[in-house]
């Protein structure tokens, strides 16, 4: 199912999708995140979309906001999309998934960023919500949108950034009051950079950490099996997974190790089914060597 067309003149929205979509199902089924986290965020989404309108906002102050926090490459954005698709499947109805990215707003000069953010929350999202169906809004890299006002200096951050954060907070409050069929999922690589008032509005804050040994082993198996089939030696996965964890690889880098291994020899590029665990281990050694040569502040 192709992405929907973003209305002309709308700033901040990079894509819209009508879910469920068969192409999106793997974003939920293949993403390796702790089962309890997946269960909790799905249950909250279902509750927020279907029950929030019936709740007393003073007794149960639901903002309809989840924050997924963790290092880059841990699958937060993929999980958000898979969550929306799974919610649509569970509800048995269409869900509109709206992707908002702070970098899609115009230059943060002369108050334009604040006005654009205000328009998004005051006009664009309520207009989309009036469709009546469940709507899930992804606020990707929210640390660039709801910037911590306590940690930002006026020398390095224009006053407009502070005003834009105020606009986000007011907008989230407004949507929470007026649009109970809208739920936000925000992602952040640096939760310390997110304004504390935004985090306090979150109904759930979930830490998506680097994968442990069991998770890395599952990721490797999921990545390798379609390529090598019966040639995969499962007993060799555990030590490789341990080495990946020791190297502090995120889930995305683990999968990209397989790409590096396939690119290591012409034979493997043309016949990927010949790939073996030893090739991936060699790719890890090369990856670790390259990463170690890059100064930490530039990574």
Give each language-model segment a name.
Residues 129-153:
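Conserved P-loop NTPase "ATPase switch" module shared by AAA+ and STAND
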Residues 196-210:
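A short helix-turn-beta junction within AAA+ P-loop NTPase domains corresponding to the substrate/partner-engaging
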Residues 138-139, 166-170, 181-188:
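Structural recognition of the conserved hydrophobic beta-strand(s) that form the central parallel beta-sheet
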Residues 116-120, 150-177:
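Substrate-gripping "pore-loop 1 plus following alpha2 helix"
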Residues 23-64, 126:
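Pre-Walker A (pre-P-loop) alpha-helix and adjacent loop at the N terminus of AAA/AAA+ ATPase modules
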Residues 1-30, 213-299:
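C-terminal alpha-helical "lid" subdomain
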Residues 62-98, 122-127:
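Walker A/P-loop
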Residues 96-130:
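Short glycine-rich substrate-engagement loop in P-loop NTPases that contacts/grips substrate
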